[in-house]
């Protein structure tokens, strides 16, 4: 807040402060969505692997929940770990585990993420997918991580400009 005051001309200070507060709120909601997504995916994986009969299903689910925060890499690592553990039990179980993770990942990417971001952050699901694609192209994994919060801030800025919001 003090930083904004020091760089903003006085006539824009109130408007920029309001924009900053709203953008921070959306970013907080994005973090809530990420935590909820981690919990949901851990639950889905735990139940799915338990049904399949994979040993240590719930330990793997905890790992999935933790690694879920790292886009693309986290699910690949946790899915690979689960598949290897299942392969140590049987080849067929390893194959079913791999199929399960692919389906779960597709469901997450195409349904869960867009819906949670729409509900909690207020961004259009298409905008979320586009932001993540652009983020991946520009910044790799870090770009994907920052894509939705940046898109939320930009959305708030455009909303502010379109509606001429004040505090």
Predicted features and spans:
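Alpha-helical transmembrane segments and their immediate interhelical loop/hinge regions
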Residues: 1-87, 91-97
């Amino acid at each position: 807040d003090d930083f904004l005051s020091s760089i903003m001309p006085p006539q824009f200070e109130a408007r920029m402060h309001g924009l900053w507060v709203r953008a921070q709120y959306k970013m907080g909601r994005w973090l809530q969505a990420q935590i909820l997504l981690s919990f949901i995916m851990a639950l889905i994986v735990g139940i799915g692997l338990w049904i399949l009969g994979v040993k240590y299903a719930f330990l793997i689910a905890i790992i999935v929940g933790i690694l879920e925060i790292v886009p693309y890499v986290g699910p690949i690592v946790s899915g690979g770990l689960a598949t290897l553990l299942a392969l140590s039990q049987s080849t067929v179980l390893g194959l079913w585990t791999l199929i399960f993770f692919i389906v779960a990942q597709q469901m997450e990417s195409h349904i869960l993420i867009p819906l949670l971001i729409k509900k909690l952050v207020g961004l259009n699901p298409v905008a979320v997918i586009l932001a993540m694609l652009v983020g991946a192209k520009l910044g790799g994994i870090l770009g994907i991580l920052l894509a939705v919060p940046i898109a939320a801030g930009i959305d708030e800025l455009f909303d502010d400009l379109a509606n001429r919001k004040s505090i």
